[in-house]
Regions:
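Active-site substrate-recognition segment that forms the wall
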Residues: 23, 28-33, 144-145, 149-233
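General beta-strand structural signal in soluble alpha/beta enzymes
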Residues: 66-69, 116-118, 152, 215
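Dinucleotide-binding Rossmann-like beta1-alpha1 core, especially the glycine-rich loop
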Residues: 1-76, 85, 202-204
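Helical element adjacent to the flavin cofactor pocket in flavoenzyme catalytic cores
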Residues: 88-149, 157
Length: 233
């Protein structure tokens, strides 16, 4: 919640979602570790960026953010880089297994009456009514679906859905990332981030709920529709 620009929807849902994950984990039965995290800085320029992230987080409602020095960095995570001179310490950070969360959310949705339509991509959207009182008809190979509210959670297809619905026009940039999974190394207990850039949060070292460590991820730009697996970048 400290990275998104204040006032955006992402800023609002990041902070609130992080707050709720402990409750969701208990209610839905997935693993969740709240370890805290650090964004590491190595010079005065990085420190200025960390201070901006701290201010963002304060406005966005992220609790207990602070800038710490090298002694505190290595007290919190002894395996952090010895060259790190500053860090943004965020004690509320946690991590999950995203596959477990997706399955748990799906099961909970089914238990609450949600119907899933498989192999039913949206091919067209008809919009009727005014902007404030719209009605949507979604055409799919499995039949039409009518609704009053339409949530665009289509991932790489989000721009197409938005266009068909007559909503915001935007362009998707496809990226493919490689993740290194370490199955024999001792666990790094908290996520360690570099200072983010305008296009990426960089390569992150983090523990997992299963006890191992992952290094994630590259962000190679790919052509739209490219879903093939690449061995390396």
């Amino acid at each position: 919640g400290y990275d998104p620009a204040p006032g955006t929807v992402k800023a609002q849902v990041n902070a609130r979602g992080c707050e709720l994950y402990g409750t969701w984990a208990q209610e839905l039965g997935f693993l969740f570790c709240r370890t805290g995290s650090m964004v590491l800085g190595f010079n005065d320029e990085d420190r200025a960026h960390l201070e901006q992230l701290r201010r963002n987080g304060y406005v966005n409602g992220v609790p207990e953010l602070s800038i710490v020095g090298p002694d505190r960095i290595h007290e919190l995570e002894p395996r952090a880089s010895a060259d790190a001179t500053y860090a943004l310490w965020c004690p509320s950070t946690g991590f999950v297994d995203p596959f477990e969360v997706a399955i748990a959310a799906l099961e909970n949705a089914v238990a609450n009456g949600v119907t899933f339509m498989r192999s039913a991509p949206v091919e067209a959207i008809e919009v009727a009514g005014s902007v404030d009182d719209a009605r949507f008809t979604l055409a799919t190979p499995a039949g039409n679906v009518r609704c009053r509210y339409l949530i665009n959670a289509a991932g790489n297809g989000a721009a197409d859905i938005s266009h068909m619905a007559g909503a915001e026009e935007f362009q998707m940039v496809w990226r493919q990332g490689n993740i290194v999974v370490l199955d024999k190394e001792p666990r790094t207990l908290m996520p360690l981030y570099p200072v983010p850039t305008p296009v990426s949060k960089g390569v992150i070292v983090t523990g997992t709920v299963h006890g191992n460590t992952v290094i994630t991820a590259t962000a190679a730009v790919r052509e739209p529709g490219d879903t093939q697996t690449y061995a390396s970048d």
